Regions:
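Conserved beta-strand-loop-alpha-helix hinge in the C-terminal portion
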Residues: 1-2
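Acidic, Mg2+-coordinating catalytic modules of nucleic-acid enzymes
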Residues: 6-24, 28-188
Length: 188
């Protein structure tokens, strides 16, 4: 872990060390959605409460090692992806009987399935975008995106191909949306 962080640019590591609390997310779209969900809940952005939302890619565990040593309050917002068992194994040092007081792993334990395919590959219903559609509806998201998708599967395809644009439109939207429970759990 020390070698990893020595090679890292350092800014996100410094952000984790200096913040009062952190919410770790995988990418830009997750960061925008968490920021907006927090804003819709509290009427202000997380940074105004000294909570830094940090995009860490797939390096969650390395950041959690630092948070654990510093006893830094941290939530992780992560996709379940294809396997709940694999996710729970990955975070076994931080959940269940191993849960740390300062670390909160937030994910949807309900596995969704469907028959949608994109370019001949099965669609993953257990990422943020399909969970956003599930928490809302096609009409709401079509209105925010300025689209007119006639089926949930068409909207799934659009959202998967335009993750950051969709998240940015949600972030900037005048109206609020519903958020998956695991996203809200990261800051409530």
């Amino acid at each position: 872990t020390e070698l990893f962080f020595k090679k890292l640019a350092g800014y996100d590591t410094l952000r984790l060390i200096l913040c009062e609390k952190a919410i770790l997310v995988e990418g830009d779209s997750d960061e925008l959605i968490v920021q907006r969900a927090y804003y819709d809940h509290y009427g202000r952005l997380p940074i105004e409460d000294e909570i830094d939302v940090i995009s860490v890619g797939t390096s969650f565990l390395r950041f959690l090692e630092i948070a654990e040593r510093l006893e830094k309050p941290v939530s992780v917002v992560t996709d379940t992806d294809w396997s709940l068992d694999a996710l729970e194994k990955k975070y076994q040092a931080y959940i269940g009987e191993n849960k740390k007081d300062n670390i909160n792993i937030c994910y949807d334990s309900e596995m969704d399935e469907g028959d949608h395919e994109i370019n001949g590959k099965a669609f993953n219903y257990n990422t943020l975008e399909p969970k956003l559609l599930k928490a809302n509806n096609r009409t709401t998201l079509n209105n925010i995106f300025g689209t007119n998708h006639q089926s949930d599967n068409d909207l799934h395809t659009y959202m998967k191909g335009n993750k950051t644009d969709c998240a940015l439109k949600i972030f900037n939207a005048e109206e609020s949306i519903n958020y998956p429970e695991y996203v809200k759990k990261s800051f409530e």
